């Protein structure tokens, strides 16, 4: 998980970077760094279906500037993000952008997919649906395999988690999910996904409480760490990008870069030993990167943005703990990759008998 968490929110605020973050300065750089660090799949739980606001403003005022100043304006954020996605894909990294299935009763047809802006779609990233699936009590337990539209009943629009799995396993675009009603199983290539009744959903087998949650009042406890998590500010922190509390953290996982704090070791033998331990410099080993051959989800966990869900671990250890929305995708992905499904006796009938819903 790469999160817009409290740390990155504070650090980028000190750097005068406004939310929503500029796509060229922030998200394009994140994609570039993660791809260089060996990520196999990069997925966004952030929508880019409208133009980059900062770039659009600069475009609107650029014509009023003298010609000699126009050359100093930064490139359009959507174009820069698209270029970083293209470069990542050329580097062997799959990039998955989130999309939404939207319904407008007065529109014909009423249902459509809200895709990222054309500049991004032109470089052909994968796309995956992020529409919420909530139970009657408001908890997130189910996850959709795909969405379908009435005017395209035979076209399966895979969800974000499913697209991540497809990209990670290198599955062909020709493979589509099919439902075995007798077994109540969805088949997707070699995968068998236990359906929740006769729906196109399955129950997520949550692996634990929210990864970044810490027991309040006791600093000796570390966050739960259900999934490895990193602050967005760490991913941006390289030699060519200065931030408050700058240590070039990400440089140790990028070929050809050595963090400043390593270069500042005065004893040459100690410096060489440290570089060897980190596997950087001439002995660089990409497999030591925590992102190597991994699915990396980018999203938000900072409380002010309110993208949180109630999950089965909401009252874990009698502590109310909301899970960032991006982490529900991570749990769904891990459930599929492990084949670790929850079997429901009686399917949905059991729930109807118990709660009368």
Question: What are these language model-derived features?
Answer:
Residues 1-199, 203, 291-357:
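Non-transmembrane functional regions of envelope-associated proteins
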Residues 144, 165, 214-328:
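Acidic, S/T/G-rich, low-cysteine, solvent-exposed domains in lumenal/extracellular/periplasmic regions
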